[in-house]
């Protein structure tokens, strides 16, 4: 067998069935949609239940989206160990080093893990445990 003699496996390459292209095609006229009726004509919207009150309208409304909500990028203490002892950690430095992807509405430092270095950390918010851990190592937690 040579390269120009290669053929696809039997039945692996089926021709697309084009519906509604004449009666002799086997799928003309009604194009596989049956006889008259709602489903033969147009489309029904997503979640349509045949005129019955749809599920999403039977359920009660709940909650709301607070337009003033602030979403903070989270940084834990254990990730701050990547920086050198005595370094000043800023939001720009965190983005540059790839610890966070986006600054969002600010940065919040949480106290997960242990901090082994003396750092000056500048962020929008600190949890109480994170602030305590940074200051116990001789560092500073500055709110910007």
Curated annotation (Swiss-Prot):
GO biological process: translation
Region (Disordered): 1-52
Bias type Gly residues, positions: 23-35
GO molecular function terms noted in the UniProt entry: rRNA binding; structural constituent of ribosome
Gene Ontology CC entries for this record: cytosolic large ribosomal subunit
PROSITE patterns (UniProt xref): RIBOSOMAL_L15
A Pfam family this chain is assigned to: Ribosomal_L27A
Keywords: Ribonucleoprotein, Ribosomal protein, RNA-binding, rRNA-binding
Bias (Basic and acidic residues) ranges: 1-10
Role played: Binds to the 23S rRNA.
Family: Belongs to the universal ribosomal protein uL15 family.
NCBIfam families the UniProt entry points to: rplO_bact
Protein name in UniProt: Large ribosomal subunit protein uL15
Classification lineage: Bacteria, Bacillati, Bacillota, Bacilli, Lactobacillales
């Amino acid at each position: 067998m040579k390269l120009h003699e290669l053929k696809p496996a039997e039945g692996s390459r089926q021709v697309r069935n084009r519906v509604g292209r004449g009666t002799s095609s086997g799928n003309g006229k009604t194009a596989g949609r049956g006889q008259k009726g709602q489903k033969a004509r147009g489309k029904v919207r997503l979640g349509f239940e045949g005129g019955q009150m749809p599920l999403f309208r039977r359920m009660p409304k709940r909650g709301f989206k607070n337009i003033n909500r602030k979403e903070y990028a989270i940084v834990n203490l254990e990730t701050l160990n990547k920086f050198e002892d005595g370094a000043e950690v800023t939001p720009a430095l965190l983005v540059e080093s790839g610890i966070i992807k986006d600054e969002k509405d600010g940065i919040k430092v949480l106290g997960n893990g242990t901090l082994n270095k003396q750092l000056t950390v500048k962020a929008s918010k600190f949890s109480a445990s994170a602030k305590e851990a940074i200051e116990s190592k001789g560092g500073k937690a500055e709110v910007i």
